[in-house]
Amino acid sequence: TKLFNAGDIQGATDLLESSASLFEVADAKTLNKKTYLEAQIDQANKNFSAAFEKFTAFKAANGVNANYDNQVQLLTSDIVNSAIEDNAEKRFSEAAVKLYLAYQINPEVNKDYLYYAASSSVNATEFEISLSYYLKLKEINYDGITKQYLAKSVATGEDVELTESEFDLYKKTNDYSDYREENTESKLPEIIKNIALIYVQLGDNEKAMSAVKE
């Protein structure tokens, strides 16, 4: 752990490998620490799937680490940032895999990443994969609706979108007027349309028609 915290990832990896025989007789607490460190090393090396598997194993073995939640959140951020880079470089298939992994880390909270995974899969022309993602989005009634905080700039007369904290703060100034909260449009109609289009792409016009009728 000291080597890893000092930034010596390779040193930490080598130490784990050279200590393999010691871990064969180690207690559960020590083994959990080993699993956690291995997960951190995988994350640092961008082996995201392996990192998630080890963090999951750590939690399943009742491992305790005060930084666990923050570390998993950081893992999610690392995965998403890597997927953004992949999309920018047109590595859509790789991006889709990572975004789906980000969704799996916390399906209740990270539904947006499933939506983006579906989109990346379409761009990768992996239609059967994208279809499975869109069908899952439909199944969980994902609408992607978010709240927007809007105000009109007194200087320009144009609407601007603010963060929630800016929205609350700027109300105390005279720089903006016409403060309002609005919801974005539902993404569900787009999801249904994409399901139908993919069925057409796959040559199943009957299911395409059925999807539209729903």
Model-flagged regions — what are they?
Residues E38, S82, Y116-A117, I195:
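Structural register within alpha-helical repeat arrays
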Residues E17, E24, E53-T56, Y100-L101, ...:
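Alpha-solenoid helical repeat scaffolds
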Residues L3, D42, D86, S120-S121, ...:
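Residue at a conserved register position within TPR or TPR-like alpha-solenoid repeats
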Residues I9, F48, F92-S93, F127, ...:
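TPR-repeat structural position
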Residues S21-T30, A61-V72, Y103-E108, I140-L188, ...:
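Flexible helix-coil transition and linker loops at the boundaries of alpha-helical arrays
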